[in-house]
Amino acid sequence: MNQVWVTGDAVVDLIPESETSLLKCPGGAPANVAVAIARLSGKSAFFGRVGDDPFGRFMQSILDQEGVCTEFLIKDPEQRTSTVVVDLDDQGERSFTFMVKPSADQFMSVEDMGNFKQGDWLHVCSISLANEPSRSSTFEAIKRAKAAGGFISFDPNLRDEVWQDQSEIQAVVMKAVAMADVVKFSEEELLFLTDSTSMAQGLQQIAAMNIALVLVTQGAKGVWRVFESQSELITGQVVSPIDTTGAGDAFVGGLLACLSRHADWKNHPVVSSAIQWANGCGALATTQKGAMTALPTQTELLRFIGQ
């Protein structure tokens, strides 16, 4: 089993509990992925920055409790932990208000990262590419991981409001896409980043980039898989969603927890199994409020997907 390094933002999500109160929940896409992997008995480590404040200490405590390695998590005394108010509609779909700009995660430096080894995975989201110095540090981490013989997983997870210059989004994010071995898009992200008007057009552009595995999630419809020049829509389990916050992160966590178990993962049996894990985790994550609350253990996941 190989280590999965995760970098970016560890966030406190404030989720409506009633008309007059907010529920404090641990979140942030990279942190969610790290916890998802750990719950599935994988090896995950988080590197990056939180504030040396109550929310930062809360996030480190959560990651430690979940079995995520936090040796390289820096508590920055000069910055504040990312805090996001999450608003849910009647269907459990969410919108975000970022309360701290810039937050501590945007100040990650090259000195913060761990030591990558052959076969390790590095998972990155685009928030860490939004501004300097985090952008340069993240691209350096990608280069170091690849040079060590590792693999790169990238989830754009676009949040326009975090970028100081939104005109940079497409070019910067597509640079990261081109460096990745595995990329997970939402349908909206694929269309935006490729300037496409249809899924087919967007997938055609991405296929030309020779990325080993591309996944495009479409919510309840399933996920498009592009692997070895073949594309296929794969459906998953149907649940009644309560809160979709973190569903995409759970999907990625399930995917990487499975892929990281295999030194030779670029084959149909492993990829198919990984997508089954990903779909199961993504579905289960929507069944309770909070991004991490319903992340399954390996036993719970295998029971859910019938293995």
Swiss-Prot record:
Keyword ATP-binding: yes
Family classification: Belongs to the carbohydrate kinase PfkB family.
InterPro entries referenced in this protein's UniProt entry, alphabetically: Carboh/pur_kinase_PfkB_CS, PfkB_Carbo_kinase, PfkB_dom, Ribo/fructo_kinase, Ribokinase-like
Catalytic activity annotation: D-fructose + ATP = D-fructose 6-phosphate + ADP + H(+)
A single MF term (Gene Ontology): fructokinase activity
The protein's Enzyme Commission number: 2.7.1.4
The protein's name in its UniProt record: Fructokinase
Entry keyword set: ATP-binding, Carbohydrate metabolism, Kinase, Nucleotide-binding, Transferase
UniProt-listed GO biological process terms: fructose metabolic process
Highest taxon listed in the record's lineage: Bacteria
Gene encoding the protein: scrK
PROSITE patterns: PFKB_KINASES_1 (PS00583), PFKB_KINASES_2 (PS00584)
